[in-house]
Amino acid sequence: MPKKNKFMNRGAAILSICFALFFFVILGRMAYIQITGKANGEVLATKATEQHEKKRTIEASRGSILDRKGKVIAEDTATYKLIAILDKKMTTDVKHPQHVVNKEKTAEALSKVINLDKADILDILNKDAKQVEFGSAGRDITYSQKQKIEKMKLPGISFLRDTKRYYPNGVFASNLIGYAEVDEETNEISGAMGLEKVLDKYLKERDGYVTYESDKSGWELPNSKNKITAPKNGDNVYLTIDQKIQTFLEDSMTKVAQKYNPKKIMAAVVDPKTGKVLAMGQRPSFDPNKRDVTNYYNDLISYAYEPGSTMKIFTLAAAMQENVFNANEKYKSGTFEVGGAPVKDHNNGVGWGPTTYHDGVLRSSNVAFAKLAKEKLGYDRLNQYLHKFNFYQKTGIDLPGEVSSKINFKYEFDKASTAYGQASAVTPIQQIQAATAIANDGKMMKPYVIDHIVDPDKDKTIYQNKPESAGTPISASTAKKVRDILGEVVTSKIGTGQAYKIEGFDVAGKTGTAQIAGKGGYLDGTDNYIFSFMGMAPKDDPELLIYVAVQQPQLKAGQSSSDPVSEIFNPTMKNSLHYLNIEPTEKSDSDKEETKAQTMPDLTDQTVAAAQKKAKEENLTPIVIGSDVAVKEQYPKADEEVLTNQKVFLKTGGKIKMPDMTGWSRREVLQYGELAGIHIEVSGQGYAVSQSVKKDKEIKDKTVIKVKFKNPD
């Protein structure tokens, strides 16, 4: 018995010691925490604060891209995703249910707004899930649709806010502007191409946050001290692009692309006095809303090719500047041997017999320019002028992807060929920059597209571009002489530019027919050329300089190589000059009916009848949206520029009836849909030829209107 007690006492002692050690460890731990305020390396006060701190995002917007007059080219727009909560556990108060209670009623109500039948919606709501979405019909919900659904007060129906990049003009300088898209990893919009990518550091937004103290349920405490990190909206970028002039260019390119199906079209409109690019476009192009891209390059700056006879402008200018061009001196046209090889005139080397250099320019004689280079200027001086006109270097335009030229000036035949636009490859933008010297009295201007950048939060201009001279290769008197003879290229019966006459305005310019280099030589065939025209107007004091190039158009019998080029140049130049209110050299009856710029009157708060009358008095075409008696909204807004006979939209409220959109442009159709708050799907290019909803039929809330476009034959 005593032996047993001995072992029991020893066990009790060991157990007591263990408890004592455990007690002292706990006591020490508590003392450590009490003194240091830390546990497991973390400050407990901070940890406790974090558990009761919540963060709420203050969303910022990506900067907009605008034209020179502030019209939107690219902007963020809010969209919404429709979701339905099916989990009954989300409802904590039966008086305020947070899940879908009546699926039949919910399906019936939603079917009136989104493009899904009641049965399809009901199938989705009957799924075994806590939360469901509605596929493509529930994405990109407009604010107007969201408001309609919210007014229905459907339990369990909610929205997730989203943002997408929107390009209201569709195909519009797309290879210049580029596009931005959502990064799937960060869920942020980032530039992926063009100016959207290059200027991403300016356009990029930074969300802000509000940090606040909350209770256990997450609700903000009444006396919470909020910490605010302010959001930073992206900067707004204003371009030199003019929306109206760009539209003139886009519309004419679309017609030519449809009619002649060329491999490429490249065109730009520039103010030669400043170097501002007012319009720039190409075909093929794409709609940045759809991102149906086939060519990621901006061909005006990224495509170097043998320019053809437009290069003769600068050889002529060099010869005139050096006083070696004698207009009345005669030479033998047809063929001329250089470096052991024949230079041939474009009529198969037949020529026009002995002719003057003056007429050689008008006829675009290769022999005339080869002889000017070899016998009058000399190759060294010609090369000096190639340097003066900056053909050996990039222009430095503020766009990504500009490539270098390739001037072949080693062999004699290449030297002579460069004088008339073969052998050496240059970019369209290099030719345009050089031509500003001709249009701007000898002073060459560097082209640019970014005008200024504004911080919208501070309403402060953080970058301001300005015109920059790229040199003075010729004198003002030489520039005038060149313009005069280029004017004759257009007006003379022997001139190659007769197709580019514009009634009321004197045009100076030069045609180009460039051979396309292939494997082992130039491509054969009558269509395998790049046809172009470099033109300026008015001739005596040019306000606009336009370059157009059309590569490999499919010409039919009876069609001329100048047809596709002139069908872009002429309407773009004429409409732009009228839009800019440039006085015609000679006024004609037809000029009175041409496009004129004017100011949009304020038609809001007027009766429909009064607003329509006022619009018609201003030579505008009013389109009424709604059935109420008074105008509540209008597009364009008051004091914005409008053109003669332009459609203007007057929104009244009430029931909306479908208009006849036949002949409307894509832009007009999309503007109508945006103001009316209806969903319109467009397909094709050109002008509206059909619509899915008949004229005068009432447009229901969920109606999707499909409009097809086609270019006129």
From Swiss-Prot:
Changing residue 309 to A: Bacteria grow as well as wild-type, are slightly longer, protein no longer binds bocillin-FL (a penicillin analog). Increased sensitivity to cefoxitin, very slight increase in resistance to penicillin G and cephalexin. CDD domains: PASTA_Pbp2x-like_1, PASTA_Pbp2x-like_2. Keywords: Antibiotic resistance, Carboxypeptidase, Cell cycle, Cell division, Cell membrane, Cell shape, Cell wall biogenesis/degradation, Hydrolase, Membrane, Peptidoglycan synthesis, Protease, Repeat, Sporulation, Transmembrane, Transmembrane helix. Residues 595-654, 655-711 form the PASTA domain. InterPro entries: Bact_Transpept/Beta-Lactamase (IPR050515), Beta-lactam/transpept-like (IPR012338), PASTA_dom (IPR005543), PBP_dimer (IPR005311), PBP_dimer_sf (IPR036138), PCN-bd_Tpept (IPR001460). SMART domains: PASTA. Its EC number is 3.4.16.4. Residues 29-309 are extracellular. It holds the Pfam family PBP_dimer. Disruption phenotype: Essential, it cannot be deleted. Depletion leads to an arrest of cell division after 80 minutes at 37 degrees Celsius and 40 minutes at 48 degrees Celsius with a concomitant reduction in FtsL and to a lesser extent DivIC levels; cells lengthen after arrest and eventually lyse. Residues 1-10 are cytoplasmic. One of its GO terms (cellular component) is plasma membrane. Penicillin-binding proteins (PBPs) function in the late steps of murein biosynthesis. PBP-2B is required for vegetative cell division and sporulation septation. Beta-lactams inactivate the PBPs by acylating an essential serine residue in the active site of these proteins, thereby interrupting normal cell wall synthesis. This protein itself, but not its transpeptidase activity, is required for cell division. This is Penicillin-binding protein 2B. It comes from Bacillus subtilis (strain 168).
